[in-house]
């Protein structure tokens, strides 16, 4: 019998760096060996304007929603919209805060990011997170020389979650999709400061993740082309040729966790440690 991994969308919404939430989500998902989350991480969500696109992304790719949002109005909006979408939502901190309030006999201050010491390291992480979110999926290409790391790769090679993981460690990270036959931005080729690294995986792995992506989204896809193994092999071949031409390192993420991939990237540039 085929031992097939089932993928699901895990949406993680935080009003701070998201580290607490990511740890909780991974601890829970690790208990289910046959299922693997496709993580969508949304840090620094602190107002309605920032939250609305996140809710749309959840509607496009339904799954499980975990959040650490102390603002009651935003938390209520998440819960209401998730009910409308038929999606499970969990306020991870609320049961803990309620237990503290009952035991201590005092209400919480509900201060955003209260668990973080406001030191230079914290502000560096916030700056890196802002940079990384602004430069996700090829956005703002003129700023690539301000990045510490630029991650490239074809679709479904964990570029965004790896970028956010690095940003949580104060590393400014941009990521760019490699699209077969489409040249990379000139601003990337001209960049001299950042470490540029390409993420790859096996054809079977990418096809499987893409199939689950298509099944779990309402967006329009040319499913046959997107998940076709021959097409993916050509995309990987194209990515490898770009890296060979420019001397960029490749990291195979097939059997690596996000943490292991990030560690492999940092190992390529010791000054990032």
UniProtKB/Swiss-Prot annotation:
Pfam families xref list: Kinase-PPPase (PF03618)
Keyword Kinase applies: yes
Entry keywords, A to Z: Kinase, Nucleotide-binding, Serine/threonine-protein kinase, Transferase
InterPro entries: Kinase-pyrophosphorylase, PPDK_reg
Top enzyme category: transferase
Enzyme Commission (EC) number: 2.7.11.32, 2.7.4.27
Top-rank lineage group of the source organism: Bacteria
Molecular-function GO terms, alphabetical: ADP binding; ATP binding; phosphotransferase activity, phosphate group as acceptor; protein serine/threonine kinase activity
Reaction(s) this enzyme catalyzes, per UniProt: N(tele)-phospho-L-histidyl/L-threonyl-[pyruvate, phosphate dikinase] + ADP = N(tele)-phospho-L-histidyl/O-phospho-L-threonyl-[pyruvate, phosphate dikinase] + AMP + H(+); N(tele)-phospho-L-histidyl/O-phospho-L-threonyl-[pyruvate, phosphate dikinase] + phosphate + H(+) = N(tele)-phospho-L-histidyl/L-threonyl-[pyruvate, phosphate dikinase] + diphosphate
Annotated residues for binding of ADP: 153-160
Family: Belongs to the pyruvate, phosphate/water dikinase regulatory protein family. PDRP subfamily.
Role description: Bifunctional serine/threonine kinase and phosphorylase involved in the regulation of the pyruvate, phosphate dikinase (PPDK) by catalyzing its phosphorylation/dephosphorylation.
UniProt xrefs under HAMAP family: PDRP
Protein name: Putative pyruvate, phosphate dikinase regulatory protein
């Amino acid at each position: 019998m085929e031992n097939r991994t089932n993928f699901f969308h895990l949406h993680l919404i935080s009003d701070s760096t998201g580290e607490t939430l990511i740890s909780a989500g991974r601890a829970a998902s690790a208990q289910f060996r046959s299922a693997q989350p496709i993580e969508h991480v949304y840090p620094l969500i602190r107002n309605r304007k920032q939250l609305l696109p996140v809710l749309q992304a959840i509607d496009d790719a339904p799954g499980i929603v975990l959040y650490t949002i102390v603002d009651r109005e935003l938390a209520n909006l998440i819960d209401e919209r998730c009910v409308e979408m038929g999606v499970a939502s969990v306020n991870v901190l609320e049961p803990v805060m309620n237990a503290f309030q009952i035991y201590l006999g005092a209400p919480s201050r509900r201060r955003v990011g209260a668990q973080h010491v406001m030191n230079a390291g914290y502000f560096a992480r916030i700056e890196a997170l802002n940079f990384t979110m602004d430069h996700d999926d090829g956005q703002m290409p003129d700023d690539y020389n301000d990045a510490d790391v630029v991650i490239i790769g074809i679709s479904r090679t964990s570029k965004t979650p790896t970028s956010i993981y690095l940003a949580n460690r104060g590393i400014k990270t941009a990521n760019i999709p490699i699209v077969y036959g489409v040249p990379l931005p000139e601003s990337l080729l001209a960049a001299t400061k950042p470490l540029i690294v390409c993420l790859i995986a096996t054809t079977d792995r990418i096809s499987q993740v893409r199939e689950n992506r298509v099944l779990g989204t309402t967006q329009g896809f040319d499913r046959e082309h997107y998940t076709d193994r021959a097409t993916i092999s050509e995309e990987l071949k194209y990515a490898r040729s770009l890296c060979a031409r420019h001397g960029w390192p490749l990291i195979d993420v097939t059997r690596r966790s996000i943490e292991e991939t990030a560690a492999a990237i940092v190992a390529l540039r010791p000054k990032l440690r």
